Regions:
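Amphipathic alpha-helical segments
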Residues: 4-17
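Short beta-strand
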Residues: 20-23
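Histidine-centered active-site/metal-ligand motif
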Residues: 27-28, 44
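Active-site beta-strand termini and strand-to-loop segments that position acidic
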Residues: 31-34
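Recognition helix of helix-turn-helix/homeodomain-like DNA-binding domains
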Residues: 39-43
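C-terminal structural segments of small proteins and small subunits
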Residues: 45-68
């Protein structure tokens, strides 16, 4: 799996219809109408996300590996 930054995953979430609800520190919180879950994406400059967090967020959004 290709490593991805929080900034890149946030852009992909927005392209899938998720809206930025608020920002608390470096954590961007996204919501989508009709969904109960929130997506919290940590954006720490150009640091890549850890693999477990990346997989979890990709399942919720949903994003395919080919979209990265």
């Amino acid at each position: 799996m290709k490593a991805v930054t929080g900034k890149r995953l946030a852009k992909l979430a927005e392209s899938k219809g998720w809206e930025l609800a608020r920002i608390k520190g470096s954590h961007h919180i996204y919501v989508k109408e009709g969904r109960i879950e929130r997506v919290v994406i940590p954006i720490h400059g150009n640091k890549t996300l850890k693999i477990g967090l990346q997989r979890s967020l990709m399942k919720i959004i949903p994003v395919a590996e080919g979209d990265l």
